[in-house]
Amino acid sequence: MSIRLRAEMADLPAYAPGKTVPGAIKIASNETVHGPLPSVREAILKATDLINRYPDNGYLDLRERLAKHVNFAPENISVGCGSVSLCQQLIQITSSVGDEVLFAWRSFEIYPLQVRTAGATPVAVALRDHTHDLDAMLAAITDRTRLIFVCNPNNPTSTVVDPGELARFVAAVPPHILVVLDEAYVEYIRDGLLPDSLGLVREHRNVVVLRTFSKAYGLAGLRVGYAVADPEIVTALGKVYVPFSATSVSQAAAIACLDAADELLARTDAVVAERTRVSDALRAAGYTLPPSQANFVWLPLAERTLDFVARAADNRIIVRPYGEDGVRVTIGAPHENDAFLDFAQRWIAPGGAGPRTGDSA
């Protein structure tokens, strides 16, 4: 007799992270190339002395430090095992069978999976020019809508919503619907496009900002994220939280990162400079790509996506495909970017997809 599982699990795909191939250049998962600062390493090492003890499940020290960092009260802060766990918690506290959760598409791949797992209905609104079509999202709101995700900058297309348009969108959403501004890549925004998302939290009780230590702060392997929200929402998030899921080592590392925030965020300038160099070189080679405000670029290659990815793998370069929509390429170290650009220029050349492994250039 087979185990009786929920019927809807049968056709629910598992989340597929970026591949790792030993010895290859991996620019598929939007990781920072920089390791932790010495002060962060020291905090991590010190925290291992107490790993036989359970971590602080209330995250008191970390919440106080985060509150100072964003100029809110600790009661406005919720900590999670990466911001992805907070996405799931936000769905759990708002949505169930018969409810709808709205998001752009393509956007963060986890949204529809988490929505379906909760028994709710995902409603995907097509992007316009690779960014959120906020008017179309407003038009898609129904009396069943409970939650709206705005991934900004958008993953995987790298674009950011105009700050003024975002503010008007938030103001137009009915106040009983939660609006989640998922800002995993906010530290890479330049060109005057940084939204006043925390100001929107102050103005609107239904707005939540999600941020993470996985990208600019370089703690992807330790899994720490946080939400800034109304205390009522924070309290509800605590009711569906998996206890102890942000470890004592993770908390210590996050606090040390906040102590060194200026130094860590200065590293993003180097990433942005490389982003500009890579984007310019790709356009010069003949690629079309939207302006990136993240630590990656988006190549909308359509039906050529899978060939590009396979040929890149032949050249020991791992990038991230999204069906037949396009390819996401992380901005890596300069030498990694050079290797990628060399391949990309050969691939797009007339008659070319670049030499396969073992072929001469």
From Swiss-Prot:
It catalyses: an aromatic L-alpha-amino acid + 2-oxoglutarate = an aromatic oxo-acid + L-glutamate. Coiled coil: none annotated. Its cofactor is pyridoxal 5'-phosphate. Keywords: Aminotransferase, Pyridoxal phosphate, Transferase. The modification N6-(pyridoxal phosphate)lysine is found at K215. One of its GO terms (molecular function) is pyridoxal phosphate binding. GO terms for biological process: L-histidine biosynthetic process. This is Aromatic amino acid aminotransferase. It comes from Mycolicibacterium smegmatis (strain ATCC 700084 / mc(2)155). The lineage of its organism: Bacteria, Bacillati, Actinomycetota, Actinomycetes, Mycobacteriales.
